[in-house]
Amino acid sequence: MKVSEKYSSILLDSGNGWLSNDKATPSYLAFTKPEISFSSIGQEVTIKSQGISNLISVDPLEVLDDYLGQGYVAVGYIGYEYSEHTMEGFSSSHEKEGDKFPDVNFLLYDPESMVSGEYEDLTSHLQMPEIKKESSLNTSNEPQFHLCPNMSICQYLNMVKKGKAYIEQGDIYQVNLSQRMIAQLRIDPLEYFLKFYNVQPVPFASYINFGDFQLLSGSMELFLRKNGNKLTTNPIKGTTKRGRTAEIDTILKAKLISSEKERAENLMIVDLMRNDLGRVSLPGSVKVNKLFEVETYSTLHQMVSEVESQVDENIQVSQVVRSVFPPGSVTGAPKKRTLEVIDELEPHLRGPYCGAIGIFYPNGDFTLSVGIRIVLTKPGKATFFVGGGIVWDSDPQKEFEETLLKSQAMTKAMDISNDAG
């Protein structure tokens, strides 16, 4: 049996992520075979159970509500293109290229089938080959695999310049723009995922096998968590690379903390998320708990804030998700206009990228990560996306370089993987 056939969903937590606790020990949640699955293109939903498929016309988030009410745990994603059904007045008007993935896609499990434990127990149980440590990874500038971006450097820089022009005109304050890359993948997707996680452990790593493709994510960003009547979001805006020495690393981190540009960018998204939460929360309950804190990962430092609010405990999951989707940190501000600008400037479909990935429980609690650092795998093929927030004083060349920085964990893991081929 291939390792990817043992579990259909695995959520890895380096600390205070999926498991929402303060444990420093990396942990996991995993599920074997789903009892039911459903996916949608727009509001045409396909439900599969016991080998039988049914197509119905309905809001997929209402289908999610229904199955949670029946006692299932749901693991999956809400894709970026579903924004057309959550953002009033927005409709895509440009043809896009690239693979079309379902807009909403969930696997449904009996809660009793969930297993959890420490990360080392998982890798031992899967009988994985020894995973190389980061220090043994290829660190040369030349990748050991052929990477195919969907835009040339010139095209990417021009896209950023056009985004800046909208900012200078006063249409928007910030916009997130991305590029897509495709690489060859010659090993089992789950083995690649664990190598990806080993390169850069994060709180919201996820592996979900939908059958015809696999979704892998190395996200470190909490989009939205509901725990009882409390909602929490941790928007990330502001990135810098790690230093080669401890001294340089400290200097780079200090520069990020004191950067007016990064603080302004972060604050804009904090204000956007406050507004989004306010539309579904109890009056006066929205508050900012943390502002401009820096989290450190193996390849970069990132600036993080936290917004919290209170909701009615009986509120439907679908109502909460509709009020805040898509994540503001990967769209921009104001949200509706930035969706229109992204639609105009980006040539590709985003799919699960910049959507929300996560787990929903029968009691209405859920945890959703922002769909960043994702890799979509099909036989022999890995597709991933990298992007960044553009503001009025962004340097297009530096923005391009930031996308390469953000892709390091994914490409380093591919270096290992394709060496094994």
Regions from the PLM with identified roles:
Residues 1-421:
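Extended alpha-helical targeting/anchoring segments
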